[in-house]
A protein has these predicted regions:
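Alpha-helical transmembrane segments in inner-membrane proteins
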Residues: 2-9, 13, 19-21, 25-390
Length: 390
């Protein structure tokens, strides 16, 4: 019972508890729980998304690291296999001794024969993997590759032309053939670009122009094979098989210079290529110059393809398999898929070289044949997946 004159406590309002909840064993009042769902969950959701992004990035970097380890392993394995046979201990001693040290026979086999072929396989595979991923991105076609636009057929025509008539020039064939193949590849690039510019640089126009150039160079190449003598025909067919046996330190240097020169421009456009996967309309709405990026990428693809096929011949399916494998592992972010596609392309070609030496040590099977045979099941898998998704 209250005494007269004492103040009456105000009635408690909704949301204002008259009694404070104290933690057990303590006189300090517990902080009131947040009741605003928006203020309480937004920071947590943002932190969760941030953590998910970092976990995904770490996973992608881990996969790239694993691919690098696999590539180094295959490079060493490729150096230890060959018709002459060489144990790993001799290879390791030869690598440490250098090209001018140690056993002369080991140094000659390792540094003058096997090393250029192994490095050339890695470089050509990396070029084709990068070119294939860029080609599929700018064309929006999962079955596109560096050969879709006729670049490979043009290189084959240039090589056949040099083999047939290069003897009339006072220049060695090992110089004339790759130079002619490179020039004809860039001519094909110019033809496709010219045809596309007559209408627009849309993916459909580029593909149609590429198919036109492809059939043109294939038909002329077939005519040259028909008219060639048996000896010349044998040389043309062997070049078209795609073999690393033609690799030299000069060809390795040229291919490496082209690859290193193109790589900064490719990685600079990684975000633009990722945006392009959203479609032309969405890319334009985000401020991307779609035609400019497509033309620039198109030229880089031509350079990479020319550097790859001019020295070793036609090698198929690497530019198709490597991009799909990279996208499956790391997704559409080209900051990760571009380097991974290059590494996977190198892994495929060096692995094909190792496999060819294992199954036929006396006469090494050209890597172009092995990649073509291995690429057929992959192509069927891609078609089946597209059919189930569509």
């Amino acid at each position: 019972m209250q005494q007269a004159g004492s103040p009456t406590p105000p009635p408690s309002r909704a949301g204002e508890g008259a009694t404070q909840v104290r933690s057990p064993g303590s006189d300090a009042p517990r902080a009131p729980a947040a009741t605003d769902a928006g203020n309480g969950t937004a920071p947590a959701a943002s932190t969760s998304r941030h953590d998910d992004y970092h976990r995904a990035s770490a996973r992608r970097l881990l996969l790239i690291g694993v691919a690098c380890v696999l590539l180094v392993t295959l490079l060493l394995l490729d150096l230890t296999t060959g018709p002459s046979g060489m144990p790993f201990a001799d290879v390791w001693r030869g690598l440490k001794a250098g090209p001018n040290g140690g056993d002369l026979d080991v140094a000659t086999i390792l540094w003058q024969l096997r090393m250029p072929q192994t490095l050339m396989g890695a470089l050509v595979g990396a070029c084709l993997g990068l070119a294939g991923l860029q080609m599929q991105t700018i064309l929006g076609n999962p079955l596109a590759s560096p050969f879709t636009l006729g670049f490979s057929a043009a290189a084959g025509f240039g090589a056949a032309l040099a083999i047939m008539f290069g003897g009339a020039l006072p220049i060695p064939n090992f110089v004339v053939i790759p130079v002619s193949a490179f020039i004809m590849t860039m001519v094909a690039c110019g033809l496709v670009y010219l045809i596309a510019r007559l209408r627009s640089a849309s993916p459909e126009i580029l593909v149609l122009a590429g198919i036109t150039v492809l059939f043109f160079f294939q038909s002329v190449q077939s005519l040259m094979q028909f008219l060639a003598s048996p000896e010349v025909l044998q040389q043309i067919v062997f070049w078209l098989f795609g073999s690393l046996l033609k690799a030299t330190w000069t060809s390795v240097t040229v291919c490496a210079l082209v690859f290193v020169a193109c790589l900064p421009f490719i990685m600079r456009d990684a975000w633009a290529l990722t945006t392009l996967r959203l479609g032309d309309a969405n890319a334009r709405s985000l401020g991307l110059s779609v035609d400019s990026i497509r033309q620039r990428t198109f030229f880089l693809v031509a350079l990479l393809t020319a550097a790859a096929v001019s020295f070793v011949g036609t090698i198929g399916f690497v530019g198709l398999i490597a991009p799909h494998t990279a996208r499956t592992l790391v997704g559409e972010d080209h900051r990760y898929s571009l380097p991974l596609a290059a590494i996977i392309g190198a892994v495929i070609l060096v692995g094909a070289s190792v496999f060819g030496k294992f199954i036929s040590p006396a006469a090494v099977i050209p890597v172009g044949i092995i990649t073509a045979v291995a690429g057929v099941p992959m192509l069927f898998t891609i078609i089946a997946r597209r059919g189930s998704e569509g």
